[in-house]
């Protein structure tokens, strides 16, 4: 079968697949497509299989139970993809053998009807092992065609299986890697990642607002810089021109100046129409002028401009209604009201006031929600987003070619060519070999010039966010626009290697270019290690990183790997652990941002509902619709609603405070609540879903969590641990001192795991015969990754056992002294005659018994 190679690039700088290889693969595929039924049967019997939709569909049943039985670290994938061709071939054979043993079975029921028309009917149940969709579908079609020719009816019973699959799919956890077949099936749903090449953060032109940090409009997306000209705007401009011309003619011409309509001058009606129709257009121009002056001020542009654009429409409506109210008040004054003797003008004035107050309240509501949401996101997630994007940049940079080294080599070649050109221009006689070496021929079209290849898709004049700008950002100077863009990158862009851009022009599956599971993260780690490390070496050194990164970035990268800062080298296991942890953190952060966005939207809807109720009350009061009796009735209803839903409203309010203000955890955090360790699966306003060690989902109300002590492992610093062992009280002090010294030496020899100078003390004495020795040490990690913690703890326990055995310290009972006093005389007819005469013999017999 075809084996997925997630991170192989046909156009990478290390390996180029020729056209002949592609043609050969195409011929093989054509041969497979032309197989007849006999060949298919042979293929099934030989154990080979194809990669088809049916196989993927039914294999979900087998993988689902195994997924649910995973431990808290979710190690559902025990096999790892290797990137070497030989290793891939071996693993392919193993996988095909396993598939033949555990192939999914599909039950088909056939009811045979006699062609002679009799009522005799025989049913047969047949089970076929379908290893591929191609083979099973072909056999099914041939069999059904044969049955139809014989007059038989085929009945398929598949409703139960579909229902089971749907229920299982709903019960999966977001923190557990999906099955490999599901990843292939739904890979098109996940957007591809734009590259971070040359220190630029990638972005989607459709989903993520762009910005240019070097210009004065760095915090304004492109969509806000462009003037929108739609049909309504065009109609407003035409109406503005027509009404201005009519107003000028009405005031300039004597015959039109005294013209009246409904006892009012014509120019007053023109002014009212001008304000009503074109007032919003004029207020929009005023908003643009205000925004222009705000953009000129750096501080205001950083801190205020986002909120100005957020409430731009509400402010524009406020100005528009304010202009309408002013025009109505000054044009239709009390004199006009007395002349007309109508209540319509007063009613219209009240309606305009109600509209203005409603718009102002809506403006305040929108501004408050945006300010609170922005401050919450910056204070809570900025540091994690900054770290996650830097990890993304490292993954894509280290998986690609050494651009810094290639650029230095190319600069040296350019200087050499310039010198040779100057020498030739000066009349120097140079050998053809030197000229051919200095001016190499152009590479073939199949190769790829990595420097001039279109790595980063650009739109307009946007250049993205450089890593230097990202490092300079902090919670105080980051703008709301940048924070919004960074959040969208984390939510929408998945981790990927640099092969993704190199494969844009190939026909390889798009799903092979991303890191969507821990299995693919380990495969990417092996690829990065082979790409960065020198041939034949087992470690990555600082000099190797400097081929890809700048000096400051390389030094910062060395601090990310366990033990690299002390040993000055990066092992393959350390690189794999870092990449897996980076993938887990990125996935948890994306889920956290999605849940937070959903919670903020729900909160916004709640506040909008309350604001709408307040606006309705204001309308009723200003329009004098609510009389005293009506207000008394409303008050009684409010009291009744408060009695019925008061506790619910209190719960919602306290849950909002717990989630947004206290905020004790995020998605993916490991917590200890009531002596039970759980991982946060999903956050909502009213509830939180947890995942226990056995993958059991537990739903806690947030109001209940507010009253409990929450121990958060993920937010804790490097945590300590305790390991105890017991020796007998008769153990010599020299051996106890040797135990302390050897345990301390072992801990100091593992600087990548623990901090040095651990405490080894005699903790307690039990029953005057057991001495308890305690080892207090501090890990260089917290206990968020509980599997890694117990792995390191197991290494220490094994070393302690080894030390105790080498020092001949074992657990055994030492002899005890027993003092037997004078025993009472035994009165019995069954006592031997010598028993009462010899008490020493009696003691010996009792002791032996």
Swiss-Prot record:
TM spans (from-to): 231-251, 274-294, 313-333, 344-364, 606-626, 642-662
Pfam families per UniProt? MS_channel_2nd
Q: Outline the segment boundaries, as ranges, of region: Disordered.
A: 1-49
- Please state where this protein is localized: Membrane
SUPFAM superfamilies the record matches: Sm-like ribonucleoproteins
UniProt KW Zinc keyword = no
Q: Which domain of life is it from?
A: Eukaryota
Q: In which broad location class does this protein mainly occur, judging by the first location in its UniProt entry?
A: membrane
Q: Which residues form a coiled coil?
A: none
Q: Which GO terms describe its biological process?
A: monoatomic ion transmembrane transport
> What membrane topology was assigned to this protein in its record?
Multi-pass membrane protein
Which keywords describe this protein according to UniProt? Ion channel, Ion transport, Membrane, Transmembrane, Transmembrane helix, Transport
Please note every region of biased composition (Polar residues): 9-21
Cytoplasm recorded as keyword: no
Q: Per its database record, what is this protein's job?
A: Mechanosensitive channel that opens in response to stretch forces in the membrane lipid bilayer.
User: What family classification does the UniProt entry report for this protein?
Assistant: Belongs to the MscS (TC 1.A.23) family.
Q: What is this protein called?
A: Mechanosensitive ion channel protein 7
Gene designation: MSL7
